[in-house]
Amino acid sequence: MTMTDPIADMLSRVRNASNAHHDTVSMPSSKIKANIAEILKQEGYIANYTVEDAKVGKTLSLELKYSNTRERSIAGLRRVSKPGLRVYAKSTNLPQVLGGLGVAIISTSQGLLTDRQATEKGVGGEVLAYVW
């Protein structure tokens, strides 16, 4: 069966693994998932990620990040733009997550950017997800 929303599947896997305090989580890989993982790493939500090449297909593995007391660095993830209801934002109305404490991941003409990067560059696009 084909997957209708691979990004939502990725976010659900990360959320479930984080809630269960797993150290790593694996999923099928794609370019957009690797770009989302890169943003999560840059923003300090995950420790690292690797793309492993297998015989069947590529696998993306994320190393989740926790504090010394095993408190999660990802408090929440939410898919915003869905296949049935796309959400777009202009460069002047880019959303802020928790007053700037979280990150909005936005697909722009210049690739995937955070809300802060998109504001700096003056570009809008499709709001993929919120991370806080």
UniProtKB/Swiss-Prot annotation:
Record keywords, A-Z:
Ribonucleoprotein, Ribosomal protein, RNA-binding, rRNA-binding
GO terms for cellular component = ribonucleoprotein complex; ribosome
Any GO BP annotation: translation
Q: What SUPFAM superfamilies does UniProt report for this protein, alphabetically?
A: Ribosomal protein S8 (SSF56047)
Q: Does the keyword Nucleotide-binding apply?
A: no
Q: Does the keyword Ribonucleoprotein apply?
A: yes
Q: Which family does it belong to?
A: Belongs to the universal ribosomal protein uS8 family.
Q: What does this protein do, in the record's words?
A: One of the primary rRNA binding proteins, it binds directly to 16S rRNA central domain where it helps coordinate assembly of the platform of the 30S subunit.
Protein name, per record = Small ribosomal subunit protein uS8
The organism named in the record is Corynebacterium glutamicum (strain ATCC 13032 / DSM 20300 / JCM 1318 / BCRC 11384 / CCUG 27702 / LMG 3730 / NBRC 12168 / NCIMB 10025 / NRRL B-2784 / 534)
The gene name on file is: rpsH
